[in-house]
Amino acid sequence: VNAEIDVLREMGVEFKCGVKVGKDITLDELRAQGYKGFYLAIGAQKSAPIGVPGEELEGVFGGIDFLREVNLGGKPAIGTKCAVIGGGNVAMDVCRTAVRCGAEDTYIIYRRSQAEMPADEEEISEAMAEGVKFRFLSAPVEIIGKDGKVSALKVERMELGEPDEKGRRKPVGTDRKSVV
């Protein structure tokens, strides 16, 4: 990320972090200072649920929420085994952060193949280098709990069907399920 920021700085981009537009400064004030273009990077505000039974169990975290808690100095109780659902850059950030927080076995569970992953190749390679294991063509169907806490994850084996509107082959369930 720092290398990407440096490239932008070299291009003349000026960063103003921690500024509340509308409170600390207004767009009109910035215009008066000669600025002509603005990019407001507010970030993702909330994790999206995956929509399977068991999401309410203790030990289930949304990716954005998990990263926010860690960035604020928190230590989420993730245990020694961690499954991260998804194949994007946030999922890569979450799995690598989980490893750094002490998870000994960290898995990416992704419903398509590696070729269809939206994450940057560099992010995937770095996650692999940090010991993250990948389980492709798997989709979560249930988060299993014991005494109100996560104990396992039930996944369904997927196959790739016809391409979707973005050109990625659509995952299709096979009814073959296993517990990981």
Language model feature labels by segment:
Residues I78-G88:
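Beta1/beta-strand and adjacent pyrophosphate-binding region of the FAD-binding site
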Residues I50-G54:
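Conserved catalytic-core motifs of eukaryotic protein kinase domains, centered on the activation segment
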Residues A91:
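N-terminal Rossmann-fold NAD(P) dinucleotide-binding loop
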Residues E56-E58:
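Flexible, Lys/Arg-rich cytosolic regulatory linkers and terminal tails that connect or flank
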